[in-house]
Amino acid sequence: MITIDGNGAVASVAFRTSEVIAIYPITPSSTMAEQADAWAGNGLKNVWGDVPRVVEMQSEAGAIAAVHGALQTGALSTSFTSSQGLLLMIPTLYKLAGQLTPFVLHVAARTVATHALSIFGDHSDVMAIRQTGCAMLCAASVQEAQDFALISHIATLKSRVPFIHFFDGFRTSHEINKIVPLADDTIRGLLPHEEIAAHRARALNPEHPVIRGTSANPDTYFQSREATNPWYNAVYDHVEQAMNDLADATGRHYKPFEYYGHPQAERVIVIMGSAIGTCEEVVDELLTRGEKVGVLKVRLYRPFSAQHLLQALPDSVLSVAVLDRTKEPGALAEPLYLDVMTALAEAFNQGERETLPRVIGGRYGLSSKEFGPDCVLAIFNELSAAKPKPRFTVGIYDDVTNLSLPLAENTLPSTARLEALFYGLGSDGSVSATKNNIKIIGNSTPWFAQGYFVYDSKKAGGLTVSHLRVSDKPIRSAYLVAQADFVGCHQLQFIDKYQMAERLKPGGIFLLNTPYSADEVWARLPQEVQAVLNQKQARFYVVNAAKIARECGLAARINTVMQMAFFHLTQILPGDSALMELQNALSLIHI
């Protein structure tokens, strides 16, 4: 197994299944393009033994145009983008879909700038292209992002319909997790070689000329447009077959629509994206309380198969909440809600369902707004109400239009072996240090490790909070650590600015980087911090990381010192092993 972030997992598959990669980096998809460029520069090869050609264009519009041109020559091509970059590609996406040209665009889904720009994640960009004719496949985790990257490349070649493979920006693209990698032999064995040959045979060639991109008149345009229906009708089966083939090769099973929960559920949430893992955890907890609940995971969003959605939804369901991670001002409701509602209403009208469940729709997670177990519990509580809100928001307090749901106070019991928080200053190395910690734990122990990093849009100087989990089982928790076993404050100036001690579990470890000794530091702490540390019976430690860094010739970079202190205090790795692994990690970084 490997410890990697979502972008790295996707880029690895895209690189190995492509021949031409046109890029123009945009947050949060940038590292996919950057890694592909670096790999090509270092001579890494795809599964056919060739080095893909990576070219950076002047904009995202140029990148998708270069992809279009490469595809017309019979090459296998891909690109990566987000947000406004995706919007610039819309005209070419229409052309690619209309010409039934197979390719995959990997999207780290991000907020589209409206009243303000935001670099953070939601589905407002991918929802703006749902009408282009591209198929849309959504991954919910780092493991799924890797696997669905390959499934997309297989399904697009089988169906000839271009695919948008998307996953939540930052929450999945930048989350580090431990996954099972796809080997070259597995990828090579699953790719459809006959369809690749057919794609090459369709290349524009003066030896056997064809005409494309014509201007059509009213006498033929409509008929030609409808003639693509059979290709779209077959997409679901191609995706399902690709998922089945992947399951045979790897043992990991997926379905385009997958239900999780009580077989006779009465309340069900329909959702797609990273929030699925959070919903699954809440469902597991509610099932132990005897509640009949479930979550329906939407993976293949376009083409939307009403038939298979309804097959996955339990017949016993009485109320359904459909969640969208986007806002469409002026619309009757958000996109996924409208699709689900239409599917249910048509089935009821045609006599395929005896009853029509009550369906409500909600918005959540815009611009990476936190969506935790308390939000999921609030939604299930709303579904139990006699008259639930038909439209709602969750995760915020809406005192303007009063659409928000009151959040539940009870939270889920933690199943992690260790949960930790690290507070640092942008560019002080805290985030990089935590990434090293996660990879060291993931790669040198049998445990699963997860890391997520919260920071603002500034390049340097802002607060960074790194969230680390270690568990015996795969980690589905796509939300922030609320209560930690270990809290590290890497900057003394934060001690009276942020509520860090409040985030500590009873009996947890609080580590403070300070120039003051253990004898004098307590008197310098704010009384509120002293009170919280006493109340929680915290184990309080101090380290003069700046002094140690200077003595070791590290200048102001305290991150390595804080890393070693973390391993020493938590004993998640024995001291000698931690030191050796840390030295190896640093040697790789600085080669």
Regions found by a protein language model. Name each.
Residues 1-128, 133, 150, 388-390, ...:
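Thiamine diphosphate
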Residues 2-3, 303-307, 319, 323-334, ...:
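Active-site cofactor/cluster-binding pocket
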Residues 3-9, 244-267, 280, 403-417:
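Glycine-/acidic-rich phosphate or pyrophosphate-binding loops and their flanking alpha/beta elements
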Residues 20-56, 249, 263-264, 268-299, ...:
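Anionic-ligand anchoring segments at beta-strand to alpha-helix junctions in alpha/beta enzyme folds, i.e.
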Residues 32-37, 66-69, 89-93, 114-120, ...:
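Short acidic, glycine/serine/threonine-rich loops at helix termini
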Residues 48, 52, 163-259:
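Conformationally flexible catalytic loops at phosphate/diphosphate-handling active centers
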Residues 119-169, 193, 346, 350-365, ...:
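Conserved thiamine diphosphate
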Residues 168-206, 313-346, 578-588:
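Terminal amphipathic helices with adjacent charged low-complexity linkers/tails
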